[in-house]
């Protein structure tokens, strides 16, 4: 299905959990994953995560956009920003 092709991944670290994005589970039409870069350093390197949290949206394994936290390690992007991107990506696949 189209939904399974779109993946939203939050990269964060356990020492920054207070700034984690807790609304990701409200997204629809996509798969959601969490990666703790304090534990999975290989993922941090592979995806070049320089600030946490970082939310990366993938379509068929290809990164289409990333949303990065500000200098205070807080995510300024909102649920709507990411849902709109997911919705656009779903529509483009038809």
Protein language model regions, located:
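N-terminal post-signal-peptidase region of extra-cytosolic proteins
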Residues: 37-42
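Non-catalytic, surface beta->alpha helical segment in thiol-disulfide oxidoreductase systems
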Residues: 57-94
């Amino acid at each position: 299905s189209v939904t399974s092709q779109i993946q939203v991944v939050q990269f964060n670290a356990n020492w920054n959990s207070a700034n984690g994005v807790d609304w990701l589970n409200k997204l629809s039409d996509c798969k959601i994953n969490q990666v703790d870069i304090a534990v999975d350093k290989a993922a941090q390197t592979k995806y070049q995560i320089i600030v946490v949290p970082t939310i990366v949206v993938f379509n068929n394994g290809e990164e289409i956009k990333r949303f990065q936290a500000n200098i205070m390690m807080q995510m300024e992007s909102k649920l709507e920003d990411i849902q709109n991107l997911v919705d656009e990506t779903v529509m483009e696949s038809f």
